[in-house]
Amino acid sequence: MKNTCVKFFVALLLFALPVAAFAQNTFKVTGKVYDAQTHEPIIGAGVMMKASNIGTITDLDGNYEITVNDTKGILVVSAIGYEPMEMLIGKKAVINFPLVQDVESLEDAVVVGYGTQKKATITGSLTTANMTDVAKSTAPTLSNALGGVVPGIISRQRSGEPGNDAAVLQIRGVGTWVNSSPLVLVDGIERSLNYVNPEEIESFSVLKDASATAVYGMRGANGVILITTKKGKAGKVKVTFRTEATNLHGLRFPEYIEGYEFANLMNEACTVSGVALPWTDEQIEKFRDGSDPYLYPNVDWTNEVLKKDAFQTTNTLSVTGGNETVRYYVSLGYMSTSGLWKEDPSFGYSTNARSQRYNFRSNVDINLHKNFSISLGLAEIVRENDFPGYGAQDIFFQLKRVSPIAYPIENPDGSFGGATTSYLNVSPYVMVTNGGFIKYTHTSTQATFGAKWDLGDLITPGLQLEGNYSFDHNYNHNVVRRKDPLIKQYVGDDPVTGEGRYNLVREETAMGYSWGADSNRAYYLDLRLNYNRTFNEHTVGAMFMFNRREYINYAAGNSTAALPYRRQGIAGRITYNYAQRYLFDVNFGYNGSENFAKGQRYGFFPAVSAGWVPSEEKWWNVNWFNHLKIRGSYGMVGNDSIGSDRFGYLSTVNKAAAGYLYGQSQSVINGMAEDQIGADNLSWEVARKTDVGIDMEFANRIVRISADYFYEYRDKILLQRAAMPDIFGAAWEQTPYANIGIMTNQGVDGQIEITNTTKKGFYYSIRGNFTYAKNTIVEDDTAKPAEPYMDTRGNVAGLPLGYVALGLFQSQDEIDNSPKQELGTYTVGDIKYKDLNGDGYINSNDRTFIGYPRHPLFMYGFGFTFGYKGFDLSLNFTGAGLTSILIDAESMWPFSLDYPAYNVMREYYDNRFVPGAADNSKAKYPVVHAGTSSNNYQISTQYLRNASYLKLKTAEFGYNFQPKVINKLKIESLRLFLNGNNLLCFDGIKLVDPESDHLGSSSYPTQRGITVGLQVGF
């Protein structure tokens, strides 16, 4: 018995030893799990000790506490939508986990046309933008932040003027002449892209092929952009405030020559033309030394009207929270961007440009029943744009018209200088500072109501009924307060009285007042039936819907334009996949538009797509190759954007045509005549699109690659008939429209991303994307030209027709031994052209299509992000290629059109052909003439430049304060950052921004922005 008791206690002791040992070696680890970018806490994240059953989850503040027993153990943290992260426990009592968002995880739901799908099962071509990268751009309009960020999007910012700085966007290039802009939907409703505050955006999808856009039918040919705004999430109330202060520095102002150089150039022109010189050396010296600034002025007009720096501020306050029943998201935003125009401080009003935007958005979701929920979205956008009394284009035109010696800013008597020549009578300075101001106000009220009814319990699992209704009201109001100060032309002092002599140019007028207003409304309704269900390894889905949109312009100028614009139709989708291995989709849209005649209003647009995922096959055992999907699609989509003219199938009558004199009073009685000739068979464009793509993920999904080849054949493009015989008997503008245009468009796009977080918490992301899209004209109804190289067919749309320049004539012998140029008189130093048809003469038959189109055929972007212990650095580059720009004619033709009035740019002066110079072989511009030189005033490769560029578009360095600091401050997150926008540009132009419309002096400069910002969460 005694031995038995001893054995029992020994056994009990041996059993207890491991337990005691565990108890003695256990210790607690605490910490916080938060978003690496926003520093907001992550609720419900799983925290596990690797290779054990020890685990916990984070609370509402993202905090966790776990008891572990091994300093060599590894903690693994995972959360939905984030990449998992591991850290060695060691002897640390506090371990924080900054999780990185899992960009487009295969299990994530991606927004598609009228629904969502798992990324793993998508067979169409679509891309989602990383809004974290987009938000790093301080551009005041969203469209300017997209180029080089999203594959498939080609963008160009034509101007930097506040309020008029939106970029032109195309998806996969240009496939039509009429309207190549994509359809933009915000929360499923057709709304403006540039009025959305980027901080309000939850997801941004770009639909590119027919499979992705077929449900939009005759609106889907140009691609679709889907923006989904943020919604509330269950949890405690979160308040986020973000503020930015930006210094904007103007880039590449137009640079003109000084007064004495202008006078010298006038003398040089007269020497070349063999006429008397207008200026003596003594007079030229007065322009240089400023000894007589009224009769011999030297005005730098650019410096007088443009300042170097401006200011921008952006602020957003958002509140989100709720529970399982009610969830809400509310956001308030304010943005203000000032312009670069100088002002007269003596006025009580501003003449500078300024753009202000006020944003309010509220999204509320309510679960009324476990199977029934409703949503209400409200938004109010107010945008105020202020400009000088004269528009920017007029001001920049005047900058190149008024020379530095034309007249002084002010005359001796204090009046403003001017000239009696009509287009020179007002100076750029007066236009900017003393011409009054214009104020535009746009107000948009948006309301969206939605309801979802889960019919799973009532009919069958996976069935859902959904409906949406929206109402948008837009109101525009403008006020014009123009004024004209007293303007005189000073012609010197009276030799007898000594008083100044003047020619009156313009009397002073009081500030005027005029205003205008217009408004419009849009209604949208849709009703959808959704079905999604999995049977073992078979997953099927379906969607069928009806939608209708009506738009009314309440300020229409005539009864036709006042009629409502209506579109309606049905759309559907069927999806099937087997074990996420074999994928198949069918999409269609059947839409109608009242733009066309009865019998022509409705069209059917189907598309099919399929995919195969070899990495899901049982025989796939390539561990480092995590995912491979091959997909393809083919379908038809349409474009019913036929311009501003409505009802092109109807003929119109001009009631104010030429008439006759009637009666004794000889009153004019107007006649009636046929006006626009209608065509009752008009229809929409049809684009037949093919897409083949591949998606890959490697190295534990650290590396992601996707690429697509696309081809589009678009016919029935609406064009006004051009090749009409004279016997037709009507003016060109009366000729009917017809669906006769044909264009093809093909190319490739793709992206790569390498993202990882090391065990020590170092985060890095390397990414790149590209888009190449080239169109070809097949038919545009133009007449067959005299020479085959002048035919538009077979060329890219948008190419300029011009001469091929062979440089400048260097000698008379070269002129004598060259083909005769019939474009005007020419001499040594003038442009030499190529004789394309070899007939010995240079004339209009020697023109061909030159360069590349203004929109780039190739666009790309790449970037880097690094983060460690709260610090992060992000760089994003954007580039474009295969694009050309023509030098603005009036900027580069010296004394353009009217010697000697027009200004002369520094670029021309420093690179011109100089008579008598030792070497003119490197001269880029022709010799100057005292008068017009039509030989040189031709569109040619001499004035064509390569507009390719690479920009450091954004750079941001930031610090997210660590949990122990923000806990002391009793806040959830705190981030400080320094941001740069448009920091560097590598290109061969240097005169203007390479994205501008013209290479010269008529574009408002873009700006470099340096921003200091703060984001705090409560």
Model region roles, listed by residue range:
Residues 854-886:
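Glycine-rich, aromatic-lined ligand/substrate-binding cores of catalytic
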Residues 134, 181, 313, 363-372, ...:
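Extracellular/periplasmic, surface-exposed regions of secreted and cell-surface proteins
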Residues 240-292, 390-391, 738, 755-854, ...:
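Conserved small-residue
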Residues 275-278, 407-415, 424-426, 430, ...:
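Extracytoplasmic gating/loop element in the C-terminal half of outer-membrane beta-barrel translocons
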Residues 255-257, 464, 482-483, 721-724, ...:
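Short Gly/aromatic-enriched secondary-structure transition segments
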